Regions:
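NAD(P)-binding Rossmann-fold cofactor-contacting core
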Residues: 1-3
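Glycine-rich, highly charged phosphate/nucleotide-binding loops
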Residues: 5-21
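Short, flexible, mixed-charge acidic loops at enzyme active sites
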Residues: 12, 133-138, 209-214
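Phosphate-binding loop of NTP-binding sites
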Residues: 18-23, 32-177, 181-192
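Adenine nucleotide phosphate-binding catalytic loops in nucleotide-utilizing enzymes
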Residues: 22, 26, 31, 151-154, ...
Length: 215
């Protein structure tokens, strides 16, 4: 709080005063855990004021980083940690997002540096992206979750697929073909798709004889 005030930023606590309800904001940065149905937030939804999450702001200032972005219902923290350990061998690796550091903090601390970021993302964070485009992304699996926040299970699944919506052909999306829900919802993928499986070998990436093979 004190640091924000030192920078001339007004801080309001214990409520949302009506004086903040304006329609001329360029955008609003929302804590991803706050529902869009909360009256104060919903005011801006109804007036079509752009609402983004911290990940989007961090990316705007650090789009030069190299991102491996992971989301899914279960296992994403484990996968993110494993990716970080692999990237560490190259050096300049950081883990961020739902674990590790906030992306905006990294953008501030390493504005001029090249970093390889293992980034764990929740669907709450993905709901508030606009330009975020990782070089590599994966939805590791899908199962019903967060139905106290999302209007439907379909909306929850669709929010996960936002992870690749801004990607280009040269980017990669890793698709888990062992998960029928991922296959059903991973559509209109704008980047190069790498299908992987633990049970099949007619895919791009598979396991055989204790090794991982990329065709």
């Amino acid at each position: 709080k004190a640091e924000l005030q030192e920078r001339g930023i007004q801080v309001y606590e214990k409520g949302h005063p009506d004086i903040l309800k304006r329609e001329d904001y360029a955008f609003i940065v929302k804590n991803p855990g706050i529902k869009y149905t909360v009256p104060f937030v919903n005011y801006f939804v109804q007036h079509q004021v752009k609402i983004v999450t911290e990940v989007e702001i961090g990316y705007r200032y650090a789009s030069h980083f190299h991102y491996g972005a992971i989301t899914g219902t279960n296992g994403k923290t484990t996968i993110t940690t494993m990716l970080y350990e692999m990237l560490q061998r190259k050096g300049n690796a950081i883990v961020a997002g739902n674990i590790g550091f906030p992306l905006s903090a990294l953008a501030y601390d390493f504005e001029e540096e090249e970093k390889y970021v293992a980034l764990e993302l929740s669907n709450f964070q993905l709901l508030g992206i606009e330009t975020f485009a990782p070089e590599v992304s994966v939805v590791c699996n899908l199962a019903p979750d967060h139905l106290d926040y999302m209007p439907s299970v379909e909306a929850y699944y669709e929010s996960k697929m936002r992870i690749y919506e801004n990607c280009q052909k040269e980017d990669w999306f890793l698709r888990n073909v062992d998960d029928p829900t991922v296959v059903a919802y991973a559509k209109n993928i704008p980047c190069t798709t790498i299908d992987f499986s633990l049970t099949r070998q007619d895919v791009d990436l598979y396991r055989k004889d204790g090794k991982v093979w990329l065709v």
